[in-house]
Every structure is written in structure tokens, then in C-alpha cells.
């Protein structure tokens, strides 16, 4: 009977970059899980490209969700796969591509993001945490999804690396020409990447506006 979120209502327009902020436990991650279909709301609807997702048959829902680009807070790379295999993992299951084609695709993606090609044959355990987050972003844009979702992309990173990740996110969104939702608690990150900000507090949307309006509100 515990209510996690209530009266949540917002739109993400084509080309927009939205940041969702709030304290730990405010429901940000629950909202992300609902958007990507891991959790269902008890009431209401979720539409992606004007398609109602909540009661959509699983096979049709998967066709839509496969075209979302998602990064999770801890990267969620597969330890047993090389970096190039991680990057193309989503489409490798959907399309028949051989090793040469796969490596060429992974190389083209990391070049767009300005990452070095020497990491492609390494395993996740052989690169830093910051680089793992970069690889997760590269994987998210594989297949050119039009909606990207980032869960705490700068969490656990020093300010310099966090700033670099934000620049990479902007490059990724620009590369696919799509829209983005970023779940974060990092106010500096919000100002760097977002066009619009939603503050979740006490289980609902407490405020919605631009980063500039947010800074004015808190007198920074």
C-alpha cells in the first residue's frame, strides 16, 4: 500500500533534453523503470511516440523498447564480453552480423564520441569506471535510438570526469538527433545538459522549469 509516485504528468518533446532531480528515495529510479517497462504504474498511462505502453502486448512493447538507448547507474556492462561486443550487444541479438562487421560498427560509434579505438578488444575489468560509463553511452546510441535515458551518469565520478561525461552525453544526443531523459542529483550536470528540469519531491512533481529558472530559484 506504499505510494511511491503520484500525479506524475510530463511530456518529452522531440529534441528536448530533460533532467529529473530529487533526493535519494524520491522515486526517480522508479519513474525510469516505469518508462522502460520494468515496472507498471497502478494507474495512468505512459506513451512513447504516441503509443500507449501500459497495456500493450509484450511482443509489441519490446519492439518499441528495443529502440530506446539506456545507460544504468553502474554501467551494467557484461564482464565476459569485450568492449566492442558490449557496444553492439543490443543489435547483435536483432541482426545477423559477423565479427568483422561488429567491430567496424563499434569503431564507427566510438569515433563519433571521440573515444580511443584501443579499448575495443579489452574487457570491462581492464578499463576505469569513468571509461566504462563512456562505453555504456556508446552502447546506448548503437542503432540510432531517438530516445536516450541516462540513470545517474556522473554518480561516483570526480567533477572533472563528470564534466567529460556530460559533454559525451550532449554529443551522443546530437549524434542520434533524438531526445534525452537524465536521472541525476548533480546540479552542475543539470545545468550542462538539460533544457528542462523536473524536481520530484514528496512523491510528486514539485517543480518544472529550465536550469536557469532553477538557479534563480535557489539563488545561485
Residue ranges of predicted features:
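Conserved ABC ATPase "signature" region
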Residues: 100-118
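Conserved catalytic motifs of ABC-family nucleotide-binding domains
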Residues: 144
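H-loop/switch region of ABC-family ATPase nucleotide-binding domains
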Residues: 184-185
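Helix-to-loop junction immediately C-terminal to a conserved catalytic motif
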Residues: 36
Amino acid at each position: 500500500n506504499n505510494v511511491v509516485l503520484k500525479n506524475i504528468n510530463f511530456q518529452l518533446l522531440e529534441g528536448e533534453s530533460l533532467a529529473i532531480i530529487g533526493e535519494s528515495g524520491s522515486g526517480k529510479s522508479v519513474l525510469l523503470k516505469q518508462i522502460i517497462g520494468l515496472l507498471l504504474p497502478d494507474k495512468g498511462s505512459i506513451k512513447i511516440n504516441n503509443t500507449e505502453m501500459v497495456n500493450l502486448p509484450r511482443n509489441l512493447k519490446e519492439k518499441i523498447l528495443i529502440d530506446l538507448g539506456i545507460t544504468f547507474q553502474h554501467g551494467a556492462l557484461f564482464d565476459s564480453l569485450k568492449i566492442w561486443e558490449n557496444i553492439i550487444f543490443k543489435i547483435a541479438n536483432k541482426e545477423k552480423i559477423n565479427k568483422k562487421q561488429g567491430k567496424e560498427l563499434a569503431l564507427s560509434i566510438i569515433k563519433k564520441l571521440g573515444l580511443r579505438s584501443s579499448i575495443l578488444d579489452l574487457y570491462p575489468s581492464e578499463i576505469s569506471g569513468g571509461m566504462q560509463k563512456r562505453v555504456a553511452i556508446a552502447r546506448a546510441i548503437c542503432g540510432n535510438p531517438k530516445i536516450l535515458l541516462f540513470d545517474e551518469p556522473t554518480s561516483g565520478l570526480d567533477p572533472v570526469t563528470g564534466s567529460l561525461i556530460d559533454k559525451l552525453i550532449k554529443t551522443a544526443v546530437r549524434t542520434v538527433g533524438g531526445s534525452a531523459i537524465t536521472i541525476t542529483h548533480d546540479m552542475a550536470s543539470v545545468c550542462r545538459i538539460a533544457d528542462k528540469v523536473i524536481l520530484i519531491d514528496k512523491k510528486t512533481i514539485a517543480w518544472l522549469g529550465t536550469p536557469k529558472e532553477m538557479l534563480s530559484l535557489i539563488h545561485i
